[in-house]
Each structure stands twice: as structure tokens, then as C-alpha cells.
Amino acid sequence: MLFIEYPKCSTCQKAKKWLEINGFKFEDRHIVEDNPKREELKEWLDKSGMPLKKFFNTSGMKYRELGLKDKLQTISEEEALDILASDGMLVKRPILIGDDFVITGFREKEWEEKLKC
């Protein structure tokens, strides 16, 4: 599994600890130092079945500064993916990617269901 995080994020820290406590092996990736590429984001979006908005860090400063709440309603998926790929701080985190799933954010129950704990 691939675990994409911002190490200073308390939710990411909690999710990482949860993975470790539950014995899951994962590759760790820093979302700012190694920002997801547009192609990766598109692949994850398709695999997840989630709406594109779920990939945006809607509580982040950058999201608010760019006025994305209103912009997202009027731009294409391609434009939105380009925006996400431009800055890791715009991307919802953590992201957990497995062979057949993609999860954004950390909600313990959802992770338990996906990982069949």
C-alpha cells in the first residue's frame, strides 16, 4: 500500500500510527516533497469512485486563498486535476492507496472496512 501524508498533519500522524498498530506494511510518501502528478491523481480518482471534490483539502489555507469552493463548480475535471497537481497542500490527506481502493482522509471505521480489520 502507498500512504501519502504531510508529516506535520495530526490526522496523518494518527492514520500512520493506526496502520502501524494494526500491522499494515506501507510505503510512505511526503505529499509536498513528492506532489502527486496529474496522471496519478486521475488514476486514483477513477479507482476511488469518489467525486473529484473529495481529493481537495477544502479546509486548507491554499484552497481558500484560491477561491476554489466556487471555482470547482465551473471548471472541467482536467483543470481541477491540473490545480491539484500544482501543489501538494491542495490535496486531501492522508491518501491510502491499495490494489483495489483509494481512501482520502482518515475515518477509522472506513479504513477498517476497506482493510477488513
Regions found by a protein language model. Give the residues of each.
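Thiol/selenol-based redox catalytic cores and closely related redox-interacting motifs
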Residues: E33-C117
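Local sequence-structure signature of Cys/Sec-based thiol-disulfide redox active-site neighborhoods
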Residues: M1-N22, F26-R29
